[in-house]
Amino acid sequence: MAFTLKAASDQHLAFARSLTHQAMGHYYRQYDLTWSDKGFDTAWAGRENWLICQEDKLVGFVSLSRDDNALYIRELHMLEDFRRQGAGSWVLEQMFAKARAESRGYLRLTVFKTNPAKRLYQRQGLSIVGEEGCFWRMESVCLSAQSSR
């Protein structure tokens, strides 16, 4: 089944917050971090947010930010029933294409060190380039539009 991205709006904030808290709560507890609804809401308001859909079903979301050199994936979460079905790989492909189309030099993200999604990111071409406490910083050079990632 095909996946699509649809622009998210403020009406999707509660879904995204709940999904992120559910998906990341284990890591917050593992690393003794404090979850903040207000912090999530503030971050959501300052980012470009996309819903991940499969046919007419909302299955996840991706949240982005940018600087002059890079497109950053700030959040990428899927509902439990839709994980390991190719959506994450598809979203990463879309984000590589977006970064190239915007002439960004890099696609970057951070991931909890114990999050198995790190393997997906590595399979898709991102490499660990540093660490910050409990996070790996990962990136991939985004080649020109004429290149095939």
Regions flagged by a language model, labelled:
Residues 89:
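Residues forming the Rossmann-fold NAD(P)(H) cofactor-binding site
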Residues 3, 7-81, 92-98, 117, ...:
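Acetyl-CoA-dependent GNAT
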Residues 121-122, 126:
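Conserved active-site tyrosine of GNAT-family acetyltransferases
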Residues 99-112:
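Conserved GNAT acetyl-CoA-binding A-motif
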